[in-house]
Amino acid sequence: MIRLTPTLLSFAILLFSIVKVSAQDTLGNIFDGPYLLYKGNQILVKEVTHSSKKVIATEKTYTLSEKQKLAIKVNFSDAPEKNFEVKLRSSLQNEPSVWAQPDKLLFLSDIEGEFDALRNLLLANKVINKKYEWIFGKGHLVICGDLFDRGKDVPATLWLLYKLEKAAKLKGGYVHTILGNHDIMNLAGNLKYLDQKYLSAAEAMGQSYMELYDENTELGRWLRSKNLIEKIGDNLCLHGGISPEINDLRLTVEQINTISKPYIGWKDLKNTVKDDKILKIFNSTLGLFWFRGYFKEPVLEETIVDQTLAQYQVKRIIVGHTITKTNVGFYYGGKILGIDVNQHEGQHEGALFEKGNWYKVDLTGNKKPIKVN
């Protein structure tokens, strides 16, 4: 029989604690939510607050009259210091499509539920502080699509952007959230890339996954207020790109967003919609959030890129969606800026426009001039 001395006992307890913490770190954030659903004159706030072998869900009910006083609490099982609260809006408005040129812009894309990547990039590049306060002044943060699917913290990512929108406005800045293919897929029920965590959590909460983001939810309404494309100063910003077929529609940025909004979240659009413009905009090869022609063979001819720049009266097109070894980088002599990097594999970078210059930025806060490939 082994007798533990006080010293050995203390060491054993310490070792057990380290193993327990390490296991928790490996799991990441096992919480999910919160999700805010509207049901009649009630507000339901649902979340998964604990999960090991069994998922345990909680639900709180409020009246609509309590909405303005309600604070949504976003909690993290693996790192409580990341917790934050969100005040709800009295109403949600569709985003404008065209903006004047800000003095400072930070572009990110394809976060896909990697909350830590988003948070750490914003901290390192002095967009927020650790209290989630906006410190980017009159600068604009632009997310070029894809908030959903592979990562473990999609709701937290959405709520953070929701929160920062108001914080930025109070300081003269702005947050632009542009939808990508993964966002459109989730809202329309195409869940082929969805992490199992979210399906298990939805089941535990007694909801279908689709009910967590439909028109009767706060996040669902918020997402449906977002654009597919925006013109910000000299920049045309979207997720995938502009194909020749989209150019041929001869639509303005405002027109694209206006006619597309009713179809965000539309199921089986290909077989139920006859409008040729809508079918092209949402096309899974040539559409705004799917097109890869700037990077994949056969690459688009530069004359087509020039046509797009002239048609929308911009100097460059900024896109995510397609990962290349040379991103964050310029292409076509600086006419295309590709910003998609592999967030899931630890490549966390973005593009910063400041004082008339373009920089690649990372988690250290370092700035390097963006190369032309």
Question: Could you say what each language-model-derived stretch is?
Answer:
Residues 24-373:
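Feature recognizes metal-dependent phosphohydrolase scaffolds
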Residues 1-26:
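Bacterial Sec-dependent N-terminal signal peptides
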